[in-house]
Amino acid sequence: MTRTLRFPAILLSAAFIAAACSGGGGGSSSAPAASEPGASESGGASGGPVTSGAAGEINVLSLWGGSEEEAFKKVLADFTAKTGWGVKYEADRQTYSTTLQSRITGGNPPDIAIIPGIGFLRRFAKDGSLKKISDLGVDASTLTQDYPEGFLAAGTVDGELYALPAKYNNKGTMWFRPDVYKAANVTAPKTWDEYKAMLETTKDKPGAMALGAKDDWNLTDWFESIYIRQAGVDAYDKLFSKDGDWTDPSVQKTVDTMLEAVNDKYVVGGITAAVGRAWTDAIAQVFGPTPKAGTFYEGGFVGGIAIGQTNPDLKIGETIDWYPFPTVGNTDDVTTFGGDVVGALTESEGAKAFVQYLITPDANKVWASTGAIVSPHKGVGTDSYPNDLVVREAESLQKAAQIRYDGSDLLPAGIQGEQMGQALQRAIAGNKVDWADFQTRVKAAWDAE
């Protein structure tokens, strides 16, 4: 069936994602960081010189950590090998947007940076900090041959391309321990009611669900995955646009539905402990050598972290796997994704070389081969991915009837995931959220753009 593209707020139809399985992928959420939108894993700054080259050196600033960072370093090493440009690489996983803004304001921007959310992309493009892709030696009009149209739109502001899609991950992946499910005599649930029944059965075998809500963006992903399935795609599109109304009853209804699973009864250690727990520690509660729970919700990037960092002895299909986020309400076959875009903040020759390298199939195949991401480049086929978990992730996006960008990342800079996530932290702790106040702040942020 032919599916059409709608794009009032970085919205994607699966027709443009077919390349993920028949020759390429599409762009996502990455995993964000403890206290900053878009960042990867909890922890401080990292990075340092990665490569040196005869042509000179560029400065690259990233928000990634763990397996995502290691994958990116392989891309940087390949860039040096192919172009002769060295890379001074820096990463800040906790205060990334503040660090990047300070560098820009101080007149010392990195040559290349990962942009922490679409709100920041709009800000940096409009204030002139980001350079147009067309000014970096790339004919932007030809890129539709290599990327699904919607993913290019993710880096576009007022009709001009400022950033390139780097990678994406499906946010509709529910991760679990097959051995725990088997021991509890449960199967992967398909509906929300079945999901709650599974939690009830496994709550003491050894525990139902792990949660790392210290990184509050994890809660925004929960909200978005339920909202789009319960309220529907049109309501989702509106909520995460400047026309959104956070006092609409559908918002609190989604929170109430979320609390049916995210509560003291089912979250290992209880909600108070979960609010103080990093999301990577929650992954370890499920996929460590001695599991404390059977289920963990987050995007496709979890597999690379669990296998690459948490427990290299995991076996796909035996001790790690995923199934689609359960259906909620009447909306079926929809999902969300998160993605990162890369932009240039200088027009140096090295920055131009990196942007030109990044759009090549080779660069994207190096990235895909690590298993940390799904590439949006059409030149990347499923044979580029290292395991079945990532192949199925790409296929799931290709098959979805409708797919939407991570909603919190569409909100204006300064609101994005942090204020939304903080509101949801209060909600799971049993406190009433003042959505009218949140609506006032969101509207003011939209009006200020």
Model regions and ranges:
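Conserved N-terminal structural module of periplasmic/extracytoplasmic solute-binding proteins
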Residues: 7-10, 22-122, 127, 139-142, ...
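Extracytoplasmic/periplasmic solute-binding protein
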Residues: 160-166, 172, 196-244
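Conserved C-terminal helix/tail region of periplasmic/extracytoplasmic solute-binding proteins
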Residues: 182, 398-449
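Extracytoplasmic/periplasmic substrate-recognition and gating elements
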Residues: 309-373
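Long, aromatic- and glycine/proline-rich binding clefts that accommodate carbohydrate-like moieties
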Residues: 368-419
